[in-house]
C-alpha cells in the first residue's frame, strides 16, 4: 500500500513541478519540502519497508496538497491577470483610434472654422507612446513570472488610460461639435428653402438675400458658425412671418 502511495505522490510531485515551469515562478518552499520529504520516505522504505512511519507519509501528502492549492491559486491569478492584460491591449488600441480620430477632427476644425475659442488639442504623442511602453514592460514582467507587482502596476496603468480615454472622447466631441453644427445648419437651410418654395415665398427679396448669405458662409472656409446660425435663424423668422 505504501509503494502505491509512493507512486501517487511521485506523480503528484512531477505534475506540480511541471505547473511551476508553466507558470514560470520560483519553486514554492512547500514543494521543496515535499520533494525532500519524498526522498527521505523512499530511502526509509528501501531500508525498512515495514517500519515506515504513517505520520511521515501523511505529512508528505499534506505538503503536496498544500502546494497544489497554492499553485492552483497562483494559476488562477495568472489567468485573471492574462485576461486583464488582453483587455489593456484593447483599451490601448481604443485610445489610439480615438487619438487618430481626434487628430483628424482637430485638423479639419482648425482649417474650416474661425473659432471664438480654440479647438481642444489631442493627447500629446509622447504620452501615448509612454502608455504603450509601460504596458510592454508589464507584459514582459508577467511573462517572466512576476504576478503581484504586475497586477498592481496594471491597476495604475488602467486608471491612467481610462482618464486619457475620457479626455480623448471629450476632445473629439468638442472638436466634432462645429462640424456637426455646420451639417445641421446646412440641413435646416435646405429644409427652410424647400418650405419657402412650397409657400411661394422663395422670391421674397429678403429671404433670397438671406439664403445667399447663409449658403456663402456655410460653404466657404473658414466658416463663422455664429454668423451662419444668425443668418439661418433670421431666414426662419422671416419665413414664418
List where the protein language model places each region.
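Amphipathic, heptad-repeat alpha-helical segments
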Residues: 1-53, 57, 78-128, 172-207, ...
Amino acid at each position: 500500500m505504501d509503494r502505491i502511495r509512493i507512486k501517487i505522490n511521485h506523480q503528484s510531485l512531477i505534475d506540480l513541478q511541471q505547473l511551476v515551469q508553466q507558470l514560470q515562478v520560483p519553486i514554492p518552499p512547500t514543494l521543496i519540502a515535499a520533494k525532500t520529504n519524498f526522498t527521505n520516505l523512499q530511502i526509509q522504505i528501501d531500508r525498512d519497508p515495514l517500519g515506515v512511519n504513517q505520520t511521515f507519509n501523511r505529512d508528505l501528502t499534506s505538503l503536496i496538497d498544500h502546494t497544489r492549492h497554492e499553485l492552483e491559486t497562483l494559476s488562477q491569478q495568472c489567468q485573471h491577470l492574462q485576461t486583464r492584460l488582453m483587455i489593456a491591449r484593447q483599451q490601448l488600441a481604443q485610445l489610439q483610434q480615438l487619438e487618430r480620430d481626434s487628430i483628424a477632427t482637430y485638423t479639419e476644425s482648425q482649417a474650416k472654422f474661425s473659432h471664438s475659442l480654440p479647438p481642444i488639442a489631442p493627447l500629446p504623442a509622447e504620452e501615448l507612446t509612454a502608455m504603450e511602453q509601460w504596458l510592454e514592460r508589464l507584459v514582459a514582467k508577467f511573462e517572466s513570472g512576476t504576478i503581484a507587482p504586475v497586477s498592481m502596476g496594471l491597476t495604475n496603468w488602467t486608471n491612467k488610460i481610462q482618464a486619457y480615454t475620457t479626455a480623448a472622447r471629450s476632445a473629439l466631441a468638442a472638436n466634432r461639435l462645429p462640424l456637426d453644427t455646420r451639417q445641421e445648419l446646412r440641413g435646416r437651410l435646405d429644409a427652410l428653402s424647400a418650405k419657402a418654395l412650397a409657400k411661394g415665398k422663395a422670391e421674397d427679396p429678403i429671404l433670397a438675400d438671406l439664403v445667399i448669405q447663409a449658403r456663402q458662409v456655410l460653404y466657404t472656409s473658414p466658416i463663422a458658425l455664429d454668423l451662419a446660425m444668425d443668418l439661418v435663424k433670421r431666414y426662419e423668422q422671416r419665413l414664418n412671418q
